[in-house]
């Protein structure tokens, strides 16, 4: 096999102006210079973010508001196993795809509007899990990272937040309990978490 250039959505030219890519299990995300997000591959759990579960071998633009608007002003993306997270310029985090373990960070496992589904087909804004927060949503985020079935975010103050599957303690909160909303990781003398360039 040899590498091939990714075609554009119409299949007649190539996807251009890409500044970042991230690969999930069977899907790929690309962030364009204009702040839009494009996805292709398997879409069983809505990981393409286009309000369908139909896979695509060509890039499709990620939408919000049940597919009516494009996800824009994105500065960073990260693909998990079958879910994705995106960081917007305003410091908010958006997530879509599989939510079986609460890895979308929207406050519930599964789909908040249809309990028969375990996924969200378009991005939803990540909520805050902090009891003392005056905000409903996670804010002032500067970096994100998706694990296979969990996610992390770093805010401007240096706080790390985690959410999703926690079967082996990957959320860093001294439990093995999953979290469907971001919780702040506590630092201390015995342990520290660092999220950034090395």
Residue ranges and their predicted role:
Residues 1-6, 38-62, 97-122, 126, ...:
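Short glycine/serine- and acidic-residue-enriched loop/turn motifs that recur at repeat junctions
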Residues 11-16, 67-72, 115-116, 131-139, ...:
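Short glycine-/Asp-/Thr-/Trp-enriched loop segments that recur within the blades
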Residues 15, 53-56, 71, 79, ...:
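Short loop/turn positions that demarcate and connect the beta-strands within blades
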Residues 16-20, 33-36, 72-76, 88-92, ...:
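Tandem repeat domain/solenoid detector
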Residues 18, 23-26, 74, 79-82, ...:
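Signature of short aromatic-glycine-proline-rich micro-motifs recurring in repeat-based ectodomains
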Residues 26, 33, 42-44, 82, ...:
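Short loop/turn segments immediately following the C-termini of beta-strands
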Residues 27-30, 39, 58, 83-86, ...:
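Conserved core positions of repeat-based scaffolds
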């Amino acid at each position: 096999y040899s590498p091939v250039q990714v075609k554009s959505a119409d299949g007649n030219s190539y996807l251009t102006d890409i500044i970042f890519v991230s690969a999930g299990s069977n899907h790929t995300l690309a962030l364009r210079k204009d702040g839009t997000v494009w996805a292709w591959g398997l879409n069983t759990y809505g990981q393409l973010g286009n309000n369908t579960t139909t896979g695509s071998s060509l890039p499709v633009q990620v939408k919000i508001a049940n597919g009516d608007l494009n996800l824009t002003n994105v500065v960073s993306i990260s693909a998990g196993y079958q879910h994705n997270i995106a960081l917007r310029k305003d410091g908010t985090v958006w997530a879509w795809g599989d939510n079986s373990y609460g890895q979308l960070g929207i406050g519930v496992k599964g789909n908040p509007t249809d309990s028969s589904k375990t996924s969200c087909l378009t991005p939803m804004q990540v909520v805050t899990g902090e009891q003392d927060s005056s905000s409903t949503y996670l804010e002032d985020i500067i970096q994100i990272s998706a694990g296979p079935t969990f996610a992390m975010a770093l805010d401007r103050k240096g706080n790390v937040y985690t959410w999703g599957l926690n079967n082996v303690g990957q959320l860093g909160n001294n439990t093995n309990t999953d979290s469907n909303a971001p919780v702040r990781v506590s630092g201390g003398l015995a342990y520290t978490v660092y999220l950034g360039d090395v």
